[in-house]
C-alpha cells in the first residue's frame, strides 16, 4: 500500500515538473489595440466588437452586407470610452477570394495600424438529415465556416509574427465538439477549426501569438432564428436540453479568454464538461487547467454516456412517431 502511495506521489511530482514550464501568457491590453472582427455586422460578432470597444479598442468590422455594417457601426460606437476610438467598416466575402481578403486587411492596417487581435466569427449554419441536404451545401459549409477563417488568419499572421505578438480567435460551436443529429454538414466545418487552431498554435507560440477556439452553445442571434426554420425535430429536441444563451454573455466570456490567451473558451457547465472531455492533445496555459482535465475526465465521460443515451432515445422516439403517422395515413 505504501509503495502505491509513494508511486502516486512521485508520478504527481513528475507531472508537475513536466508541466511547470507552462507559463500563462501576458494578457493583451485592449485599450488602443486594433481588433478585426469578421461576421461583425450581427450576432456574436457584433457583440464581441462592442465588448472590445468598451475596453478602448479600435475596431474593424468585416461582413458582406454594407447596410448591416453601417447599422452595426452605429451600435458599437455607443460604447466608446474615449473620443479617439474608431470603427472601420469593410464589406467583403471572407470565404470567396483570398486576394480580396488580403487587400482589405491591408487597408485596415494602413488606417488603424497592425492587427492585434483577429476574431474569426463569420459563419453560417444549416441543419437537415444527411440524405436530404443538397451536396453543394456541404461544400458551402466548409467554404464559409473553415476557409472563411483561414483567409483572414493568413492575411494577418505575417505581421503578427514580425511584431511577435497577437491573438487569433476562432468562433466554433458546441457542435464542433460533438456531432449531433442534423449537423452532418455543419459539424465537420466547425470541427475543422479545432485542427487548424491546434496546428497554428504550435507554430505561433514561439512568436508570442496565442490562439483561442470558442465553443458557444445555441445563441439568440439572427442566424440561429433562421436555422430553426428548417431544423429537424430531433435536432430541436436535443438542442433544447442545453437552452439558449444571449450573445452579449457569450461575447464577454470569449473576449476575456482571448485576452488571457486561453486556447479553449467554453460556456456553462455543459461547455466546461465538453471541453474537458474533448481536450485531447490541445495546449493548456496553466498547470491548474491541465490537472482539472486529468482529474475530471472519468467523471465527465460517465455523465456524457447518459447524455448520449438520452439523445439516442430522442432519435428513436421521433422515428417511431413518424412511422406510426405514416401507418395511420395509409389506413385512411
Swiss-Prot record:
The active site is at 172 (proton donor), 186 (proton acceptor), 190 (lowers pka of active site tyr). InterPro entries: KDSR-like (IPR045022), NAD(P)-bd_dom_sf (IPR036291), SDR_fam (IPR002347). A motif (GXSXG) lies at residues 39-43. GO terms for cellular component: endoplasmic reticulum membrane. NADP(+) binds at residues 186, 190. Pathway: Lipid metabolism; sphingolipid metabolism. One of its GO terms (molecular function) is NADPH binding. It is found in: Endoplasmic reticulum. One of its GO terms (biological process) is sphingolipid mediated signaling pathway. Residues 1-25 form the signal peptide. Belongs to the short-chain dehydrogenases/reductases (SDR) family. This is 3-dehydrosphinganine reductase.
Amino acid at each position: 500500500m505504501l509503495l502505491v502511495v509513494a508511486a502516486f506521489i512521485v508520478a504527481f511530482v513528475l507531472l508537475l515538473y513536466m508541466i511547470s514550464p507552462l507559463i500563462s501568457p501576458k494578457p493583451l491590453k485592449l485599450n488602443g489595440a486594433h481588433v478585426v472582427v469578421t461576421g461583425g455586422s450581427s450576432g456574436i460578432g457584433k457583440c464581441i466588437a462592442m465588448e472590445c470597444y468598451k475596453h478602448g479598442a479600435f475596431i474593424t468590422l468585416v461582413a458582406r452586407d454594407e447596410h448591416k455594417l453601417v447599422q452595426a457601426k452605429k451600435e458599437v460606437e455607443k460604447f466608446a470610452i474615449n473620443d479617439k476610438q474608431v470603427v472601420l467598416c469593410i464589406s467583403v466575402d471572407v470565404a470567396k477570394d483570398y486576394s480580396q481578403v488580403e487587400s482589405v486587411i491591408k487597408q485596415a492596417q494602413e488606417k488603424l495600424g497592425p492587427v492585434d487581435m483577429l476574431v474569426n466569427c463569420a459563419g453560417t449554419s444549416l441543419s437537415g438529415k444527411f440524405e436530404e441536404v443538397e451536396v453543394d451545401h456541404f461544400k458551402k459549409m466548409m467554404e464559409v465556416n473553415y476557409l472563411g477563417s483561414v483567409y483572414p488568419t493568413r492575411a494577418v499572421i505575417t505581421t503578427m509574427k514580425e511584431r511577435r505578438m497577437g491573438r487569433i480567435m476562432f468562433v466554433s460551436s458546441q457542435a464542433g465538439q460533438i456531432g449531433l443529429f442534423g449537423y452532418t454538414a455543419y459539424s465537420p466545418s466547425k470541427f475543422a477549426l479545432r485542427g487548424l487552431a491546434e496546428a497554428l498554435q504550435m507554430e505561433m507560440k514561439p512568436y508570442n501569438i496565442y490562439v483561442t477556439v470558442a465553443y458557444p452553445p445555441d445563441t439568440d442571434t439572427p442566424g440561429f432564428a433562421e436555422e430553426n426554420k428548417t431544423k429537424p425535430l430531433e435536432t430541436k429536441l436535443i438542442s433544447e436540453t442545453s437552452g439558449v444563451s444571449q450573445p452579449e454573455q457569450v461575447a464577454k466570456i470569449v473576449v476575456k479568454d482571448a485576452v488571457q490567451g486561453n486556447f479553449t473558451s467554453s460556456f456553462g457547465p455543459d461547455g466546461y464538461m465538453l471541453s474537458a472531455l474533448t481536450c485531447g492533445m490541445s495546449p493548456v496555459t496553466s498547470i491548474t487547467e491541465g490537472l482539472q482535465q486529468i482529474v475530471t475526465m472519468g467523471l465527465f465521460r460517465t455523465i456524457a454516456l447518459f447524455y448520449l443515451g438520452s439523445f439516442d432515445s430522442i432519435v428513436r422516439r421521433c422515428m417511431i412517431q413518424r412511422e406510426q403517422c405514416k401507418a395511420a395515413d395509409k389506413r385512411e
